[in-house]
UniProtKB/Swiss-Prot annotation:
Domain of life: Bacteria
Upper classification of the organism: Bacteria, Pseudomonadati, Pseudomonadota, Gammaproteobacteria, Thiotrichales
Organism of origin: Hydrogenovibrio crunogenus (strain DSM 25203 / XCL-2) (Thiomicrospira crunogena)
Matches recorded under InterPro entries: LuxS_sf, Metalloenz_LuxS/M16, S-ribosylhomocysteinase
Gene: luxS
Listed name of the protein: S-ribosylhomocysteine lyase
Binding-site list for Fe cation: H54, H58, C128
Keywords annotated in UniProt: Autoinducer synthesis, Iron, Lyase, Metal-binding, Quorum sensing
Length: 173
């Protein structure tokens, strides 16, 4: 199995909350797609609760688009990580980490401004696969944690696993 980019960085030294350019690629049409690692929690230390991350998924995807989409950026997808320590965001364009962090922070403030469960988009059995698994209170707690701690930057070159370590962990490199 090929070694995926997300597993070539040392999760033990990764900071959170922090933004990281996980990958960039060119499409056949010449557009640049950038994938960001939006790390909410320190890996293997803390993770978001399932109800909170699910509610945040519904809110964050729209809110960050409102603050980041522009003539030079269009978000393709914002999805929670299986480990529940963050989200991956794929977009067309190349915004820098500060611009992404600023939009993320504004989106977290938007989450705090949501008043009731009925204000959560697509919260129904037709548009959500587990519509009863939500908590606005948990989502707000996650957002407040980001606001309280601020958002840093993880650079790949500072957290990359070296080839010897990857080999020792059983990876073909």
């Amino acid at each position: 199995m090929p070694l995926l980019d997300s597993f070539t960085v040392d999760h033990k030294i990764m900071n959170a909350p922090a933004v990281r350019v996980a990958k960039t690629m060119k499409t056949p049409g010449g557009d640049t797609i950038t994938v960001f690692d939006l790390r909410f929690n320190k890996p293997n230390v803390d993770m978001m609760g399932e109800k909170g991350i699910h509610t945040l998924e519904h809110l964050f995807a729209g809110f960050i688009r409102a603050h980041l989409n522009a003539d030079d950026v269009e978000i393709i997808d914002v999805s929670p990580m299986g480990c529940r320590t963050g989200f991956y965001m794929s977009l067309i364009g190349t915004p820098d980490e500060k611009r992404v962090a600023d939009a993320w922070m504004k989106a977290m403030q938007d989450v705090l401004n949501v008043e009731k469960m009925e204000d959560i988009p697509e919260l129904n059995e037709y548009q959500c696969g587990t519509y009863t698994m939500h908590s606005l209170e948990e989502a707000k707690s996650i957002a407040q944690n980001i606001i309280d701690h601020g958002i840093g930057v993880n650079k790949n070159e500072n957290i990359a696993l070296d080839k010897e370590t990857l080999k020792a962990l059983g990876n073909d490199v």
